[in-house]
Amino acid sequence: MSDSKYILIIGGMGPQASAFAHRRLVEEFQLAHRGGELGNADYPRITHLSINVDDFIADPGKKLGALNYINACLRDVNLKSVDCGFIACNTAHLLFDDLQQTTGGRLISMIETVKESVAGQKIGLVATPATISSGLYGEAIAPDEAGVLKIEEIIRQVISGVPARDLAGGLQIEIEKLKNRGAEKVMLGCSELSILGEFINLDYIIDPVTLIARKVIE
């Protein structure tokens, strides 16, 4: 137990997405140790901060207040004992540099992890308008204006509690449009969309949540 890794999840943006990230972290740990007998003490220690932050993604004017609140929540954690951590939200990586400073360099970037994985490929991106316009993922094939609005509404419905299975079909339509426009892979660039990905049977989807979960347990 004393040798297990201590992982920090900065989540709550939204809560369903970071709960999904926590589950994927445990599942990827199990896959990495397949064949062995895992006891409870073998799993990593995980602190999951599900932070009820204001929606600074839709309202950039709330960004500074959100950052201050997240930093205040992080002060409740003994960061010196954390081995590594990640932000369970794509768009919240707009705050990555500030939060990396707060955590003493302990965070692993989901964005950089994904970019390394897809280097050299033509990528499509379904995400929040903020993630698309920010260029966090560099050049990517994005949905048209109607598609962006549809995806944003799907994300909001996930956060409001609509079952993921009921929303997956609408997302799949937008993903297939990007494939038809030449994307080799399509990235689920919002953690709420990663939840829906479990109900979409397409072999060219990239899930950043799964990739960061694998990275932090290495």
Name each model-derived stretch.
Residues 1-218:
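Non-catalytic structural scaffold of enzyme domains
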